[in-house]
Amino acid sequence: MKNIEIEGKKISFEVKSKDVRYVYLKLKPDFSLQVTVPRNRDVDINKILEKKRPWLEKKVREISQKIKIFDKNTVLYRGERFEIKTYYVKNPEKRIRLYKKVAFVYEDSNKKKEEILMEFLERETMKYVKERVEEFKNELNVTYASISTKNMKKWGYCTKDGKISFNWRLICLPERIADYIIFHELLHLRHFNHSKQFRSEMEKYFVDSKEIKKTLKRYYS
């Protein structure tokens, strides 16, 4: 891989030839750059990267402000970052314990750290969602068909027949943002769109809606 320095960061990039008409650039969260060029066509990559430098600088700044939900060493829980410490224990009584910003994970031959964390977060998300849904549905006077958690890119989704799904990582977010997402999906039971009336009701309950949406875009897994 070749490298280019943008905003003080070393960006590694690879070039792929595909059946496309134009050159495409994609900067990933790990600051690796994918350059796609038309097949069988001579392209001056360095010239293109210099031309796109202002765009790349903007993207690097945006990614630098993003908040990673969890990685090998840390995990977010209710908006707080916990250091992960893993121990191998035969037949552990508890799989995970949170104490003073540390997540103690007890794995064995049957379950590893990643699976334990995922199950814990999914369980905590469902518990939190159920509590908040019961409160918000009475506030909105709506009924739903079912509530579930899924592994998906969106934070939440509501179908026309009242089935609501939430991202199992929801519990990682600050409570104010998680509540916004839950309320947002429940409100779709009253307005199945993002009409002016829908937005007006959201802002009635969440006067900081614009700031919440802006902050939410910073979180990624």
Predicted regions and their residues:
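Walker B catalytic acidic pair
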Residues: E185
